[in-house]
């Protein structure tokens, strides 16, 4: 199991991203718009820098829903390889069977 604090921190970051996503998108569009004057684009850059860092989507870490493990994460299943193996052996993941040939 991952540390509870790491899992909770990631949950907090996900909430911040959801809250600030629209504002970040607007500011980034202003910054990237070449037709606007440079002063206005610079002001948008400063406003973007004032937003919390954890509100950026790149700060989110994919973690296993079962264990909180950050590595060996399968996006489709939202769990790590270890949790997948354990639940697969118990027959709790539909369609997963032990291989034999």
Swiss-Prot record:
Main function: Binds 16S rRNA, required for the assembly of 30S particles and may also be responsible for determining the conformation of the 16S rRNA at the A site.
Assembly and binders: Part of the 30S ribosomal subunit. Contacts proteins S3 and S10.
Gene for this chain: rpsN
Disulfide-linked positions: none
GO cellular component: cytoplasm; small ribosomal subunit
Family that this chain belongs to: Belongs to the universal ribosomal protein uS14 family.
A biological process from GO: translation
Statement: the UniProt record of this protein carries the keyword rRNA-binding: yes
GO terms for MF: rRNA binding; structural constituent of ribosome
InterPro entries, A to Z: Ribosomal_uS14, Ribosomal_uS14_bac/plastid, Ribosomal_uS14_CS
Keywords: Ribonucleoprotein, Ribosomal protein, RNA-binding, rRNA-binding
Source lineage: Bacteria, Pseudomonadati, Pseudomonadota, Alphaproteobacteria, Hyphomicrobiales
A Pfam family hit: Ribosomal_S14
This protein's name: Small ribosomal subunit protein uS14
Organism: Rhizobium meliloti (strain 1021)
């Amino acid at each position: 199991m991952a540390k509870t604090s790491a899992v909770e921190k990631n949950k907090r970051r996900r909430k911040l991203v959801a809250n600030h996503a629209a504002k970040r998108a607007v500011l980034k569009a202003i910054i990237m718009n070449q037709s606007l004057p440079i002063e206005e684009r610079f002001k948008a850059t400063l406003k973007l820098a004032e937003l919390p860092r954890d509100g950026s989507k790149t700060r989110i870490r994919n973690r296993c829903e079962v264990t909180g493990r950050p590595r060996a994460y399968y996006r489709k299943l939202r769990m790590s390889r270890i949790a997948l193996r354990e639940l697969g052996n118990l027959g709790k993941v539909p369609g997963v069977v032990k291989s034999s040939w």
